[in-house]
């Protein structure tokens, strides 16, 4: 006796899938404003500030453009040593998932898949700029998503309280 669990059309539900159709550099900028002085050895490590953002936009019914933006700046005191900005995108096909799973997929799973490639591009850019490669620590996209949802909830509550008091 066999059990047929595969979808064969005729109304059978398709298994959920997440596919990367394309990956691309949307924007890359490296600035070394103090070169060549900025390349000299220093007594202490520079301070590094990193900002991360994720955006997702629909392209078609099941296709989405997800862009992971990484901005990193190294400073020695008040002097900027380098500034690197990367917008790294991926086109994802998402099908068979319940609607309530779409935002977490687009803002957690998709950037998690893009991150290793974006990290390598940033490391190569800083190395090619004359600095040691900047190896960005892994990012907790689930925590970022939770924070973003909490901020949007607060904004919505403030907007609702402003409309009810006017």
From Swiss-Prot:
Family in the record: Belongs to the SecB family.
Subcellular localization: Cytoplasm
One GO process term, biological-process aspect: protein transport
Subunit structure: Homotetramer, a dimer of dimers. One homotetramer interacts with 1 SecA dimer.
InterPro entries: SecB, SecB-like_sf
UniProt-listed Pfam families: SecB (PF02556)
Known role: One of the proteins required for the normal export of preproteins out of the cell cytoplasm. It is a molecular chaperone that binds to a subset of precursor proteins, maintaining them in a translocation-competent state. It also specifically binds to its receptor SecA.
Keywords assigned by UniProt, alphabetized: Chaperone, Cytoplasm, Protein transport, Translocation, Transport
The keyword DNA-binding appears for this protein: no
GO (cellular component) term, any one: cytoplasm
GO MF annotations in UniProt: unfolded protein binding
Annotated protein name in UniProt: Protein-export protein SecB
Chief location of this protein within or outside the cell: cytoplasm
């Amino acid at each position: 006796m066999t059990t047929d669990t595969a979808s064969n059309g005729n109304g059978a539900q398709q298994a959920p899938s997440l596919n990367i159709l394309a990956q691309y550099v949307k924007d890359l900028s490296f600035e070394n404003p103090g070169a060549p002085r900025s390349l000299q050895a220093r007594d202490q490590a520079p301070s590094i500030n990193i900002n991360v953002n994720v955006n997702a936009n629909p392209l078609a019914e099941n296709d989405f453009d997800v862009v992971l933006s990484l901005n990193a700046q190294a400073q020695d005191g008040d002097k900027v040593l380098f500034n690197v900005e990367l917008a790294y995108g991926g086109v994802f096909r998402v099908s068979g998932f319940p609607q309530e799973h779409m935002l977490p997929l687009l803002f957690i799973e998709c950037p998690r898949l893009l991150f290793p490639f974006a990290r390598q591009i940033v490391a190569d850019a800083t190395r090619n700029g004359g600095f040691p490669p900047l190896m960005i620590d892994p990012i907790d996209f689930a925590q970022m998503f939770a924070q973003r949802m909490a901020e949007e909830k607060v904004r919505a509550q403030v907007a609702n309280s402003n409309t009810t008091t006017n």
